[in-house]
């Protein structure tokens, strides 16, 4: 790109010209970005910063927490609680909502986040990231957990920051998807891609094949057809990619196409899926749709789901539109 446009300038210009971003939302997104920079620096220190390894505690999901899970969660809370933009926050790592303390002014927004997605990859130096989503608090006094239970189509901003070879922030406010890369010397996120688009067709899928025996019939059918390649009903060869970090897998799909699958499986039949609707599926689904892709549970558009609880789980199929629609069709035919 000819001129270097910082995240701040990009958001200010969106606010002035497009009217997509109210001033308070712009300020909130800048604070989230600063928190991501701090998390990135902490992640980069690795063993030198004493941040690797397990914290020997479990989160609300019953998952063992890494030290960096807890650190990233605290960074996001401390950065956002005092600015006056938020009424409350909710995190994958916390049991309930975090209401902004009375000593700080309260704003009109609700922030949800997975502070460190893919944390099983921390100790082996593979890309991880932070996912976030912003909603408007419904009218009324005080803040309740119920206020967060809005379908994903009500989001006013969503994004993620991937900590890999570069630190990259990907953002939507409902007017396409933009990507920013952290210039460490300058200390700023710089716009490096606008109007990102996911190709409608692909020859690449991302799924954990070790779980194949636990999948439902439509998912087995789809993957089996992909694996048959040119000799099968699809008439083309497919490649498989799987990082085990949703941020990394979705970032690849946003930049070059593909389809991401994290389906329901028979090991926990009472749960509709593994990924969290509010902290992972909704923000990623909106980003993908804003880039021309699709996101489905196999039976329903993810963004139309009405959450029933804060830590609700869901099956996720997202990415290149024609592939996601094929998976949904297979579910309908089952």
UniProtKB/Swiss-Prot annotation:
* Protein name as annotated: Fructose-1,6-bisphosphatase class 1 2
Hey, which pathway is this one from? Carbohydrate biosynthesis; gluconeogenesis
Q: What is its main location?
A: cytoplasm
Listed under GO biological process in this entry are: fructose 1,6-bisphosphate metabolic process; fructose 6-phosphate metabolic process; fructose metabolic process; gluconeogenesis; sucrose biosynthetic process
Gene name in the database record = fbp2
Family matches, as Gene3D superfamilies? 3.40.190.80, Fructose-1,6-Bisphosphatase, subunit A, domain 1
Which residues are the signal sequence here?
A: none
Q: Where does Mg(2+) 1 bind?
A: 92, 114, 116
Q: Which reaction does it catalyse?
A: beta-D-fructose 1,6-bisphosphate + H2O = beta-D-fructose 6-phosphate + phosphate
The record's annotation in SUPFAM superfamilies points to: Carbohydrate phosphatase
CDD domains noted in UniProt: FBPase
Q: Which family does it belong to?
A: Belongs to the FBPase class 1 family.
Q: State the species of origin.
A: Albidiferax ferrireducens (strain ATCC BAA-621 / DSM 15236 / T118)
Keywords for the protein's UniProt record, in alphabetical order: Carbohydrate metabolism, Cytoplasm, Hydrolase, Magnesium, Metal-binding
**What GO MF annotations does this protein's record show?**
fructose 1,6-bisphosphate 1-phosphatase activity; magnesium ion binding
- For this protein, what is the EC number? 3.1.3.11
Give the PANTHER family listed for this entry: FRUCTOSE-1,6-BISPHOSPHATASE-RELATED (PTHR11556), SEDOHEPTULOSE-1,7-BISPHOSPHATASE, CHLOROPLASTIC (PTHR11556:SF35)
Q: What is said about its interaction partners and assembly?
A: Homotetramer.
Q: Per the entry, which co-factors are needed?
A: Mg(2+)
